[in-house]
């Protein structure tokens, strides 16, 4: 199940750090971006943060998947 996360996004920091190793960089886009988390059996397996850059342009800032679920 994919869930749109609108608050307390930082609780997924460990997952986001898999794709962006600097917490300071994550802090720059996390709150202004739209966040989606993929759950399986109530466990977050993947996360994606997308920002609106204006002029009908969106950018994927972070897309992270737990290592054991990558390449599937």
Predicted regions and their residues:
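Conserved glycine-rich acetyl-CoA-binding loop
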Residues: 66-72
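Short amphipathic alpha-helix that is part of the acyltransferase structural core
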Residues: 1-27, 37
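Conserved beta-strand in the GNAT
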Residues: 37, 43-52, 56-64
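Short, small/polar residue-rich loop motifs at catalytic or cofactor-binding pockets
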Residues: 30-32
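Extended interaction regions within the primary functional domain
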Residues: 9-12, 35, 57, 66
